[in-house]
Amino acid sequence: MSGHNKWSTIKHKKGAADAKRGKVFSKLIKEITIAARMGGGDPDANPRLRTAINAAKAENMPKDNWERAIKKGTGELEGVNYEEFQYEGYGPGGGAVLVESLTDNKNRAAAEIRHIFSKCGGSLGEAGCVAWMFDKKGYIVVNQSVTDEDTLMEIALEAGAEDVREAGDVFEVITQPDDYDAVKEAIDAAGIETEDASVTKLPQNTVEVTGKEAEQMVRLLQTLDDCDDVQNVYTSADIPDDAIGED
């Protein structure tokens, strides 16, 4: 596994605009609902739900909102029946793209995702064509201005992290999914502020994408992420900072 998770950086830069459009809350509510449906409404016994609730709290979602989403997932309240699907393909420049969809209409989602790939210069592939290139990991980003590497490494590794590495002006903490909560809590307890933290999928290897293809790749990723039926987008593309535009 190598390379900075650039798509996470892109989403972080664009996060404020997404929040204004309500997309962050909408995606979190979907995730909480399906996590509760699949694993029950007790976050202590449901790691996926616990992670989703923590993400909602980090975005300052009102407690009533996520509690209602849990009840819809467990059936206590009537709600939309979301299903999970995965789409795989390649973007401009050859970077792998993995798309996770939570939708109440598979046909609509598939058609829209296929259209986005085509419109933005990508190609949608068969199931299994790129999923094997990604590993599910806990991923925590800490700016180097708030702590030093030795301090962060000691805290993170003691809590169960598998790696701490330098990437530009940040440190990346990598964990197994089951260890993510404990590591994040240990970093928070030490008073170290995090820039980004989630259970995500990281590429085992990255593909450098530059120039016009990098700009096209960013457009593909952002258009996919803006789709209401898309929950998460992952890529193996290593995109230069100058291709990552501000909103």
From Swiss-Prot:
Signal sequence interval, chain numbering: none
Upper lineage: Bacteria, Pseudomonadati, Thermodesulfobacteriota, Desulfobacteria, Desulfobacterales
InterPro entries per record: Integrase-like_N (IPR017856), TACO1_YebC-like_2nd/3rd_dom (IPR048300), TACO1_YebC_N (IPR049083), Transcrip_reg_TACO1-like (IPR002876), Transcrip_reg_TACO1-like_dom3 (IPR026564), YebC-like (IPR029072)
Pfam families in UniProt: TACO1_YebC_N, Transcrip_reg
GO molecular function, one term: DNA binding
Source organism superkingdom: Bacteria
Main location per the UniProt record: cytoplasm
GO biological process: regulation of DNA-templated transcription
Keyword Metal-binding (UniProt): no
Organism of origin: Desulfatibacillum aliphaticivorans
GO cellular component term of the entry, any: cytosol
Cell compartments where the protein resides: Cytoplasm
Annotated protein name in UniProt: Probable transcriptional regulatory protein Dalk_2958
Protein family membership: Belongs to the TACO1 family.
SUPFAM superfamilies attached to this UniProt entry: YebC-like (SSF75625)
Keyword DNA-binding: yes
Keywords tagged on the record: Cytoplasm, DNA-binding, Transcription, Transcription regulation
